[in-house]
């Protein structure tokens, strides 16, 4: 964050809540994009990292006690947290604390989402919260967690599960639940092959967001019991299903506060979803509003000059249409259409970039043609490179997604990346 955010929505309830963000996953469906970074550290939206959305939701909700559990290739994530999220007031009991995997129990790394929290129980005890809010650090959405906390207390729940409606054909990727008239969860299946639909809505299913609120003592008891069992030590696979018949598990539907309809939430866990969700932002009125001053997305703000567009000749003109171009970029006699450029990208004379997501510090030399692609950080494309026009050639040289998006990384280009930050 460029400066410490002003207090908002802070109450006794939010003050007595500890957040644990699960940020240790690789996100293997993002292919080579997560070879050198954890999924929550993947750049998104022109200037952010994916985890910034979850962290910003916490800050904007008035929750200022946050632990981030890391494991897989965490250096770039830890560096980002240190640079961008170190301005909270420790003397006021506010913090973003990094909790790396340390083999605290029996010398093992995190065996699942529940085990990750179990291995940090001593830290949770030290902070002594009334409630523990468990979040995933790899989704893109805006959510005020305050109403969910209030609902958890009002209903006397042992655990509250955030949920949303999804198309039934996509529900197999989620934990799917059924609820009664009071939103009490009566059935929960993790990634079922044949997901049940919502009664009266045969094309929709109620899916878990991977957001859980536990009463502290109840959480401790469940995690200690699970650690003694042979299981996957996972909230969705083990903890939540085991509680349906013996505890009060309440669903909290995530809805748009203004309309009451379906709220914006994206899992950017595949190359196609990552590309599509980024390019949604270049629309005239995207559903995810990054310009909303009432719910800002905080991040580390590198000090960079404004983007620059140069040359206005008949044969070369630096211009961008239906695009977002971040600070530090130089568009030198090149044409951009419906693309999103992160910071410090250079596009040289005669190059044409369409339907592309270009990550920071990429350099596109003269005469390149790029279409429907994701270009990773630090890539340097040689003059005349063509991407996105010949699927067979793209598949041979790069990674071609099922949806036809071409992923290009420095390693695919034979470029050294071991000595740069990711």
Swiss-Prot record:
Entry-linked InterPro entries: ADP-Glc_PPase (IPR011831), ADP_Glu_pyroP_CS (IPR005836), GlgC_bac (IPR023049), GlmU/GlgC-like_hexapep (IPR056818), NTP_transferase_dom (IPR005835), Nucleotide-diphossugar_trans (IPR029044), Trimer_LpxA-like_sf (IPR011004)
UniProt EC number: 2.7.7.27
GO MF annotation, one: glucose-1-phosphate adenylyltransferase activity
Keyword Nucleotidyltransferase: yes
Secretion signal span: none
Reactions listed under catalytic activity: alpha-D-glucose 1-phosphate + ATP + H(+) = ADP-alpha-D-glucose + diphosphate
GO biological process: glycogen biosynthetic process
Keywords for the protein's UniProt record, in alphabetical order: ATP-binding, Carbohydrate metabolism, Glycogen biosynthesis, Glycogen metabolism, Nucleotide-binding, Nucleotidyltransferase, Transferase
Pathway: Glycan biosynthesis; glycogen biosynthesis
Sites where the protein binds alpha-D-glucose 1-phosphate: 110, 175, 190-191, 208
UniProt keyword Transferase, yes or no: yes
Pfam families: Hexapep_GlmU, NTP_transferase
Family: Belongs to the bacterial/plant glucose-1-phosphate adenylyltransferase family.
Subunit structure: Homotetramer.
Role, per record: Involved in the biosynthesis of ADP-glucose, a building block required for the elongation reactions to produce glycogen. Catalyzes the reaction between ATP and alpha-D-glucose 1-phosphate (G1P) to produce pyrophosphate and ADP-Glc.
Protein name: Glucose-1-phosphate adenylyltransferase 2
Lineage: Bacteria, Pseudomonadati, Pseudomonadota, Gammaproteobacteria, Chromatiales
Gene name as annotated: glgC2
């Amino acid at each position: 964050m460029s400066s410490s955010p002003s207090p908002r929505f802070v109450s006794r309830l939010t003050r007595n809540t500890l957040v644990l963000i699960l940020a240790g996953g690789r996100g293997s469906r993002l292919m080579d994009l997560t070879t050198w970074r954890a999924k929550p550290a993947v750049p998104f939206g022109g200037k952010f990292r994916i985890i910034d959305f979850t962290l910003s939701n916490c800050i904007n909700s008035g929750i200022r006690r946050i632990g981030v559990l890391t494991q897989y290739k965490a250096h770039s994530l830890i560096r980002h947290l240190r640079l961008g999220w170190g301005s909270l007031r420790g003397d006021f009991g506010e913090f973003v604390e990094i909790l790396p995997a340390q083999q605290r129990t029996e010398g093992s790394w995190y065996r699942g989402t529940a085990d990750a929290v179990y291995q940090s129980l001593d830290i949770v005890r030290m902070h002594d919260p009334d409630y523990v809010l468990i979040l995933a650090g790899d989704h893109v959405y805006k959510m005020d967690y305050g109403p969910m906390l209030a609902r958890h207390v009002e209903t006397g729940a042992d655990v509250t599960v955030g949920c949303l409606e999804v198309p039934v054909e996509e529900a197999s990727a989620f934990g799917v639940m059924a609820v009664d008239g009071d939103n009490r969860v009566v059935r929960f299946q993790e990634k079922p092959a044949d997901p049940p639909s919502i009664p009266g809505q045969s094309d929709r299913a109620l899916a878990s967001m991977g957001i859980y609120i536990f009463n502290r003592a109840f959480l401790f008891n469940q995690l200690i019991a699970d650690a003694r069992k042979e299981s996957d030590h996972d909230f969705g696979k083990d903890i939540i299903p085991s509680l349906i018949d013996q505890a009060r598990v309440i669903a909290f539907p995530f809805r748009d506060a203004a309309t009451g309809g379906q709220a914006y939430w994206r899992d950017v866990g595949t190359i196609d979803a990552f590309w599509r969700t980024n390019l949604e932002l270049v629309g005239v009125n995207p559903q995810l509003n990054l310009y909303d001053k009432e719910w800002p997305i905080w991040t580390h703000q590198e000090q960079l000059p404004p983007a620059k567009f140069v040359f206005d000749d008949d044969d070369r003109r630096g211009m961008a249409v239906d695009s977002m171009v971040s600070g530090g970029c130089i568009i030198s006699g090149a044409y951009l259409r419906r693309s999103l450029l992160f910071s410090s990208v250079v596009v040289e004379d005669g190059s044409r970039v369409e339907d592309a997501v270009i990550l920071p510090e990429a350099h596109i030399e003269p005469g390149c043609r790029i279409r429907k692609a994701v270009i990773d950080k630090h890539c340097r494309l040689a003059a005349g490179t063509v991407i996105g026009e010949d699927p067979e050639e793209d598949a041979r040289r790069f990674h071609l997604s099922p949806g036809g998006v071409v992923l290009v990384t420095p390693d695919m280009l034979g470029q050294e990346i071991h000595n740069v930050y990711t």
